[in-house]
Amino acid sequence: MKKISVTCERKEDIALLKEAGADEVIVALEGGVFSSLQTFSIAQIAELLTQARLVQVQLFVLMNRLFPQSEIKHAQQELKQLLEIGVDGVIIADPGLYQVAKGLSLEDKLIYSPETLVTSAEDAKFWLSTGMYSVNISPLLTEEEILKIASSVRHCGIQVFGYLLMSISKRPLLTAYQEVANIEEPLHHNHHLYLREQKRDGMMPAYENEAGMMIYTDFVQESFAWLEPFSNAGIQRFEMYGNYIPQNALFDAIRMYRRVLDGEDGESVRKEFVLKYPELPVSDGYYGQKTIR
């Protein structure tokens, strides 16, 4: 079954996401993510899980930080709590969390998603051989490279919509800039900051939390015309990230992606979306570009 998995930042949106066509919702763990998404405590996630069960949608937790030695024990304990309350899965990037799930015989609840690091079939096969549920392919690859991995390895996923996380620094660079430039407005946990390169017009969302600073692409990844070949090659999970996306555009994108997966022509649906949301800097990203090695 091909599943659409969408980020969720409000409890009241769970039912709406299900109605729009989402099979899974992704919620971010407080203190556990490299992401600008709204985060939730484990107690809050338990409440979200109850709501998800009511509307019959699966709930996955994003926990994609890399944890230093001083924090890994606490992170492992949080993962244990999440698995014990019954979430459908946890999306991780730190291999140090794997042993906890294995000790509970719940390694099949993990999705390995190290942002841009899964770039070959060998990578994906290795992580799936550990018993994990799924592996996310890097979205910064060409169509040819993605199809090669997907056709060789089952149970893969990929981000197909939203701004892509491009850069992470554990240093609080925005806070440092605020101090040097004597800026009064708080830059920490500020969702309204963008970077622009001197010779480019694109605006890159920038965000800082306790884990560090993150920079996103200056384009919104869209994959309307690519859903059919990706699906035919074997990709099973299609992730859609809604941070920095207007809610109406995100919900329309979900509905339109569902239409494509149900058989409509992807290019025609893409044109419909672009016509409706001309202000969004949508792009097919790196699908048609040669990866530099």
Describe the predicted segments one by one.
Residues 1-116, 136, 143-293:
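Active-site pocket-lining/capping segments in soluble small-molecule metabolic enzymes
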Residues 131-132:
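As written
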